[in-house]
Amino acid sequence: MSNWLLVVYRDWLVHIVHRLKLELLKQRYLHIDETHVQVLKEPGRKNTSDSYMWVYCSIRDAVNPIRYFEYQPGRSGKYPEAFLREYEGYIHTDAYSGYNAVSGVKRCLCYTHLRRAFVDALPKDIHNSEASKPAEAILRLNQLFNIESELETLPPDQKKKERLIREKPLLEAFWSWAEKSAIGELPKSKLSKAFHYALNNREGFWNYLEDGNCSISNSLAENCIRPFVIGRKNWLFSGSPKGAEASAGIYTLVETAKANGLAPMKYIKYILSDMPGSAFLEHPEYLDDYLPWNPLVKEFCR
C-alpha cells in the first residue's frame, strides 16, 4: 500500500500539490504552524531524530482556501524563509524566533498563545494572592476576545475601524499594566515568562490592527494541523523522506478538499480517474481543471 501511494503521489498528485502552493503564495494572509514527526532513513540522522511537518493555511474567509503541508528535517527558520522567499503579506504565527528569518512580511502574533501563558502561570489555588496578576491578565485579554466575537461578521474595513476604536485602548492599557506588573517577579517563574512573552513581542501583537483581514489568533493553523497530529498517534512515523513528502502532499489534498466543502475520497478519485488523460505536462495550465474550486470538480466531488 505504501509503495503504491508513493508512486501515485510521484506520478500524479504531486503536480496538483505544487499548483496549490503557487496559488497559496498569491494570497496576502497566511496562518503557519509546525509539529514534530519521526522520519526514518534520513541521510546523516538517527531514526530517533525529530523532523517537522509545517502547515501553511489560508485565512478563514479566503475565497479559495488552501491547507498546505510541507515536510522538512528540522524546525530552523530557514525552512519558512525558503517557503516564503517571494511572499509579501501578513503571516499569523506564534512567537517562535525561527519566523524572524522570514523577510518582507508582517507577523501577527497569537493572543491565544499569550493568554495560555498567563493561564499556565495561575497557581493551583486560585485564592492564593499570587493568582491576582495572571487572573487580571486573563480578564484583560478576554475583553479583547469578546469584542472580536462581536466583530466577527463585519467586513474587513469596518472591522479595522472598530478595532481601533474599541480594542486599541484596551491594548494600550494592557501593555502599560504589564510593564508595571512585571517588575519584581522572579525571573524564572511562569508569570515572569508570560510577561516577557508579551513585552518582548509587543510589535507582533499589535500588527493585526493594520488590516481587518488579520486575526488575533493562530488557532486556525493549529486546527489545520490537528488531523496530522491525530494520525501520527496511529502510524507513528514515516518510513523515509520520500514517504514523509508524500504524506505531506496527501494531507494537503485531503485537508484542502475539506476546506472547500469536497469529499476527499471523491476528490482524489476524480483526479486519478481523469488526470491520466490530460496533457498537463505539455500544458501546465490544464492543472487548473483539478483545483478544488473548479466548478466541475465541485459538481462531482461534493
Cite the ranges covered by each PLM segment.
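Catalytic center-proximal scaffold of phosphoryl-transfer enzymes
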Residues: 1-302
